[in-house]
Amino acid sequence: MTGLKRDMDIINRATTKPFICKDGSEIRELLAYRNSVIRNQSLAEATIAPGTSTQEHYHPKSEEIYYILRGAGRMKIEGELRDVGPLDAIAIPPGARHKIWNTGTVPLILLCCCAPGYENEDTVMVE
């Protein structure tokens, strides 16, 4: 650490509290301006229960990357549907309507990276 400025933040998932996001998924915010030195993006873990989905939505300002850690799902972006699973990275441009379903029998767990960082106000619900 130099002076009063923090140079590094390490946040362990176990220290974060889950909350239900505007799209209906359970979120754990891992890194964002609210809890770290990060200013221009955010990283969160999302969990979607078997047989459920997020609600279709879009972000006027933010682009997103989903990275699937566990489970099986179906991703919809602007009407296109694709099956997704572990180790798949999904690019979601700003303004693109999107939704993800858990099509498996275990929780669908993914990382969500938003740039600029996630804000509830930048989420517009379609459904």
What are these regions (language model features)?
Residues 29, 44-59:
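Conserved short histidine dyad/triad with adjacent acidic residue
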Residues 46, 66, 90:
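Conserved GNAT-family N-acetyltransferase fold
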Residues 50, 61-62, 80, 96-97, ...:
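A generic "binding-loop/recognition-motif" signal
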Residues 53-55, 74, 90, 94-100:
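Histidine-centered metal-chelating micro-motifs
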Residues 94-120:
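Ligand-binding loop in jelly-roll beta-barrel domains
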Residues 79-94:
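Short acidic-glycine-tyrosine-enriched beta hairpin
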